Amino acid sequence: MVSVSEIRQAQRAEGPATIMAIGTANPANCVEQSTYPDFYFKITNSEHKVELKEKFQRMCDKSMIKRRYMYLTEEILKENPSVCEYMAPSLDARQDMVVVEVPRLGKEAAVKAIKEWGQPKSKITHLIFCTTSGVDMPGADYQLTKLLGLRPYVKRYMMYQQGCFAGGTVLRLAKDLAENNKGARVLVVCSEVTAVTFRGPSDTHLDSLVGQALFGDGAAALIVGSDPIPEIEKPIFEMVWTAQTIAPDSEGAIDGHLREAGLTFHLLKDVPGIVSKNIDKALVEAFQPLNISDYNSIFWIAHPGGPAILDQVEQKLGLKPEKMKATREVLSEYGNMSSACVLFILDEMRKKSAQAGLKTTGEGLDWGVLFGFGPGLTIETVVLHSVAI
């Protein structure tokens, strides 16, 4: 008779979880940051708020963002005036948009990832879908299964309302699934649409205005599995270790609340300080077992919640400016896409590493770290090992 331990052994993969493909997608509507304050105050009928507009212009100028992509066009916003007001009841209108657009944008990214992977979609065993945009039953995971034509017995995990740290969460979950289920191939999708958070400006809620200056729409998809099939599946990054922690004394630092007026966003001024104060401890826990204490010797992927967070992390750790190059590039070209951001940065890094003729997918380095920061304040840490190009 076979023992339980023998069964468990047979169920486990041999090697580490590996990212085998990455795909990204954005809505067609591209918004230039330099002209966005004019558009935003006009479409929300707020042009009479001259001082507030000047303040918003300064926020946009300091954001280090050149452009963003948004599902919400001028036409859609004119058809839905309640979405343009500051706190008008508008949840139904927002939900009607995102329950369709979130899985649709997710499909676009997933199709690209599956194509790069090069295997038939029938070999996908698990699906992890993550969004902070809207809630529905059956969920966006179900809708994507239908849109892609996945097998009905794909094992699905739906993560709603997690916020900006969740790009790290999906990697942590995908790692555990791939390593504990031999032959598993996990499709990971993060799809974010700002139709839930868009609203007009308010003199009394400036943190909402910060969100209006930063957030953009995007979806990213990965294929994750252990023991890549030689000559068929090409590894990009290996996931070696993961952790999640709540930063001490950080309650209320980042909050989001789903209300009749949509998803409201609340932010304390000291978020960059809280992140930078706690990042050293997270790094020691992650890299001490590898005997790494020089954080300039690893590659960096950090959720770009905003430029101030990146600046303070660099300053606290004495990081060279080029360490955050891929992160800042994604912030500049797409804005803060919540959970999808770090997956976009993975894609940016492996592409630029290949273009520059470097020896690994991680800017020529062997080891790297991926950080997610979000409500809680929650910090996700993923230790990555690059692959030879």
Swiss-Prot record:
CDD domains: CHS_like. Pathway: Secondary metabolite biosynthesis; flavonoid biosynthesis. It catalyses: (E)-4-coumaroyl-CoA + 3 malonyl-CoA + 3 H(+) = 2',4,4',6'-tetrahydroxychalcone + 3 CO2 + 4 CoA. One of its GO terms (biological process) is flavonoid biosynthetic process. Pfam families: Chal_sti_synt_C, Chal_sti_synt_N. It is an enzyme of class 2 (transferase). Keywords: Acyltransferase, Flavonoid biosynthesis, Transferase. The primary product of this enzyme is 4,2',4',6'-tetrahydroxychalcone (also termed naringenin-chalcone or chalcone) which can under specific conditions spontaneously isomerize into naringenin. This is Chalcone synthase 9. It comes from Medicago sativa. The gene is CHS9.
